[in-house]
Amino acid sequence: MNNIQIRNYQPGDFQQLCAIFIRAVTMTASQHYSPQQISAWAQIDESRWKEKLAKSQVWVAIINAQPVGFISRIEHYIDMLFVDPEYTRRGVASALLKPLIKSESELTVDASITAKPFFERYGFQTVKQQRVECRGAWFTNFYMRYKPQH
């Protein structure tokens, strides 16, 4: 496994995080969603994203001095977790999620079909299946909750 370092988001990361998001949606999530859905999802409104990231706690996974994934949290809600497809199945998403699981009493996420098994491996449970609209396309996702077992 590569040496993964986790650090706080820096404004200079913005374009690389956008690229990771686009690649993750178009290459990884395309296994579970139609071309129309991917086209609707894989768009970035830069001003909205910058505003969202400013309101969030964001951590970036670094391998060989390059951002390869990121996670963002607003209070107890995981808003985004994306890994560059070149680095999937190498522990990047786990390295981003594990510190949150250790530090939070509860976490929630709206997980894609693609991400649902990953979150289940860490003890997240599906609260409900949802149909959500994004730019005219309808998606299935899952509202999931994590509570530590005591």
From Swiss-Prot:
GO molecular function (one)? acyltransferase activity, transferring groups other than amino-acyl groups
Induction or repression:
By SOS response. A member of the dinB-yafNOP operon.
Pfam families hit by this protein: Acetyltransf_10
Q: What is its EC number?
A: 2.3.1.-
- Cross-referenced PANTHER family, in alphabetical order? ACETYLTRANSFERASE, ACETYLTRANSFERASE (GNAT) FAMILY PROTEIN
Q: What class of enzyme is it?
A: transferase
Q: Which residues form the N-acetyltransferase domain?
A: 4-149
Q: Which gene is the coding source of this polypeptide chain?
A: yafP
Has keyword DNA repair? yes
Official protein name in the record: Uncharacterized N-acetyltransferase YafP
Q: Which organism is it from?
A: Escherichia coli (strain K12)
Which keywords does this chain's UniProt record carry?
Acyltransferase, DNA damage, DNA repair, SOS response, Transferase
Q: Which family does it belong to?
A: Belongs to the acetyltransferase family.
